[in-house]
Amino acid sequence: MDPQCTMGLSNILFVMAFLLSGAAPLKIQAYFNETADLPCQFANSQNQSLSELVVFWQDQENLVLNEVYLGKEKFDSVHSKYMGRTSFDSDSWTLRLHNLQIKDKGLYQCIIHHKKPTGMIRIHQMNSELSVLANFSQPEIVPISNITENVYINLTCSSIHGYPEPKKMSVLLRTKNSTIEYDGVMQKSQDNVTELYDVSISLSVSFPDVTSNMTIFCILETDKTRLLSSPFSIELEDPQPPPDHIPWITAVLPTVIICVMVFCLILWKWKKKKRPRNSYKCGTNTMEREESEQTKKREKIHIPERSDEAQRVFKSSKTSSCDKSDTCF
């Protein structure tokens, strides 16, 4: 018979056994890379010893996780994927499965047989359903472009290494007056080995109010949790108003007026100091001209007088000489 058909038939029989047992499986949750407790919940009302019992756990594919045969662990029947990953607590009748992987999720059975000389008798069965979770990292916002004209910004929000697949990823924009949620198309990728998810969204977020500062959050929603990113703050630059010349004129005009007044004052003082000197010089020149004219007049008047006197002297000297010599012309 085809091995795949055989495995499929085994799984069907195992599920049917769960259904026919009449007991709902105990739901267990554990986290990736941690430890899950698979209880057997055996009351042992007859106080039977482990040396009389055969206890083992198997998964939904009938692969044996652990077997305690008459009080001793038996590894011959343990599947390789569980080898070295289990430990049995005889006090609580619990099997611990370590280093959990996503693929460990599913149905498990704890089965106990009582070994008698006549054969094995099943005395207990416990069904468990294991869910394996992995917490996503805190969402992170990364801008992929600068703010464009205070109108919008392109950004990416991402979260990694989580399981199961999240329900929703969005961006929340808060301003002073409003709160807006932007939904994006979630991009998913799953690791082939760990089966963990990485998710992200890329959005162009427009600003509803360009006059106020804003805060952006990234939100990741799973079945159990709601993760919030650290706040991403945006401080918009205030639009520059047109240049106002009135304050400039108001500041400069008094200075100009003061400078003009000082200049006029200096000029007035300079003229005031210069004016007496000019009048003095003018008076001096006038006096000098008058004295010169008077001198000239005097010279005109005085020169003939001196000529008459000279003529008289000359005549007198001539007469006297004529008298002495008695010869005159």
From Swiss-Prot:
First-listed, main subcellular location of the protein, grouped into a coarse class: membrane
Domain of life: Eukaryota
InterPro entries: CD86_IgV, Ig-like_dom, Ig-like_dom_sf, Ig-like_fold, Ig_sub, Ig_V-set, T-cell_Activation_Regulation
Cytoplasmic side: 269-329
Gene Ontology terms: biological process: adaptive immune response; B cell activation; cell surface receptor signaling pathway; cellular response to lipopolysaccharide; immune response; negative regulation of T cell proliferation; positive regulation of cell population proliferation; positive regulation of DNA-templated transcription
Gene Ontology MF: a single term: signaling receptor activity
Basic and acidic residues: bias regions: 287-312
Disulfide bridge partners, by residue number: C40-C110, C157-C218
One Pfam entry name: V-set
Record localization: Cell membrane
Residue span of region Disordered: 277-329
Tissue: Expressed by activated B-lymphocytes and monocytes.
Record has Cell membrane as a keyword: yes
Entry keyword annotation includes Cell division: no
Ig-like C2-type domain boundaries: 150-225
Example of a GO cellular component annotation carried by this entry: external side of plasma membrane
Cited function: Receptor involved in the costimulatory signal essential for T-lymphocyte proliferation and interleukin-2 production, by binding CD28 or CTLA-4. May play a critical role in the early events of T-cell activation and costimulation of naive T-cells, such as deciding between immunity and anergy that is made by T-cells within 24 hours after activation. Also involved in the regulation of B cells function, plays a role in regulating the level of IgG(1) produced. Upon CD40 engagement, activates NF-kappa-B signaling pathway via phospholipase C and protein kinase C activation.
Quaternary state and interactors: Homodimer. Interacts with MARCH8. Interacts (via cytoplasmic domain) with PHB1 and PHB2; the interactions increases after priming with CD40. Interacts with CD28.
Protein name: T-lymphocyte activation antigen CD86
Organism: Homo sapiens
